[in-house]
């Protein structure tokens, strides 16, 4: 994706120096999301919170986005009364604390489906994924990153997405 370099106040970690031309701010990254995209958000403790917050706080967010996710924890904002403040439509396969208020507000479609079926549905195109927002480990000596603790439905979303935006987490462990 063509982009301008990150602002000078944005420090690129040493581990990412060899990939400096691919490092952008969260705001720049989510700026590549198009109107009408179906955006998969990584799950559980591997939810890319910085990317989600950048998308939610974008000055001119893309229109008609659908955020698709399974299990999220403290990923989406709520006001002091507990109401969801998301700006987008959501589709979820799990009703956790993040989504309860939004479901009551009519902002989320709950799809009762076993998580074991979700990867097949994505692969068959029955669940659309245009963009995948994920969290990964820093690259190893060969430039490979790891999905770490979240290798549930993320591989299916990555393989189907037109655009994959990864938030690098230095604390993410590597998995095989």
Outline where the language-model segments fall.
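Conserved alpha/beta enzyme-core scaffold
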Residues: 1-176
């Amino acid at each position: 994706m063509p982009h301008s370099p990150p602002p000078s106040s944005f420090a690129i970690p040493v581990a990412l120096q060899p990939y400096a031309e691919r490092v952008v701010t969260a705001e720049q990254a989510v700026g590549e999301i198009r109107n009408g995209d179906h955006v998969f958000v990584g799950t559980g403790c591997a939810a890319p919170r910085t990317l989600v917050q950048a998308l939610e706080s974008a000055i001119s967010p893309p229109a008609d986005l659908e955020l698709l996710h399974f299990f999220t924890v403290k990923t989406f904002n709520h006001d002091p009364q507990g109401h969801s403040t998301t700006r987008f439509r959501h589709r979820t396969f799990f009703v956790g604390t993040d989504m309860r208020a939004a479901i009551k507000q009519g902002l989320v479609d709950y799809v009762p489906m076993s998580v074991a079926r979700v990867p097949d549905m994505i692969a068959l195109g029955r669940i659309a994924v245009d963009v995948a927002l994920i969290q990964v480990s820093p690259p190893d000596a060969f430039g490979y990153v790891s999905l770490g603790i979240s290798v549930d439905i993320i591989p299916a979303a990555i393989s189907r997405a037109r655009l994959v935006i990864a938030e690098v987490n230095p604390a993410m462990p590597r998995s095989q």
